[in-house]
């Protein structure tokens, strides 16, 4: 949504696969009305995820894996001063006056964007956590072996997503410490 970057964070993905960004977003913006004709309601701010998977299935994004998304994250352009701002803010509270009061500063990205691309970006090392949208590569099949890790492959399903309302839930979880202490409910 252009909070930390002058471009949509998916731009390096579109550039890598020679996808016209304007056409992609135009298609995405038309999807709610398109699916409404079939009686299906889609989330406006996250339906782009399913459309990315349509591009993968159509062969327009060959070889798109979570690892590839992470690689492409290195190409996300940030506004001037980002990521330096993160370390400057941390340094500003690394003073005895703040430490004696146990004041801590944590940085999180809460986004409808792609977690793997953020993990591969220049800001990842400055973050305490990333909340966003993720893909499954090889889905578990009926009767899958629970003792083994999932296999790798092309992204094929949406694992989870944040939309503009669930971002608020993520903020409450961070505030409460659920991300640090899973036993907290």
Task: Annotate the PLM regions.
Residues 122, 130-185:
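Conserved acidic, metal-coordinating active-site core of Asp-based
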């Amino acid at each position: 949504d252009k909070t930390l970057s002058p471009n949509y964070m998916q731009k390096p993905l579109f550039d890598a696969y020679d996808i016209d960004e304007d056409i992609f977003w135009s298609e995405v913006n038309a999807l709610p009305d398109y699916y409404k004709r079939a009686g299906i309601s889609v989330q406006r701010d996250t339906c782009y995820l399913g459309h990315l998977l349509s591009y993968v299935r159509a062969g327009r994004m060959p070889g798109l894996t979570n690892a590839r998304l992470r690689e492409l994250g290195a190409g996300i352009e940030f506004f001037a001063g980002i990521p330096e701002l993160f370390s400057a803010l941390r340094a500003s509270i690394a003073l005895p006056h703040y430490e004696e009061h146990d004041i801590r500063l944590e940085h999180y990205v809460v986004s409808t964007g792609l977690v793997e691309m953020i993990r591969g970006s220049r800001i990842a090392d400055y973050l305490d956590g990333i909340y966003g949208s993720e893909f499954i590569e090889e889905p578990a099949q009926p009767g899958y072996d629970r003792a083994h890790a999932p296999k790798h492959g092309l992204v094929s399903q949406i694992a989870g997503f944040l939309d503009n309302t669930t971002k608020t839930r993520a903020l409450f979880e961070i505030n409460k410490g659920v991300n640090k202490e899973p036993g907290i409910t």
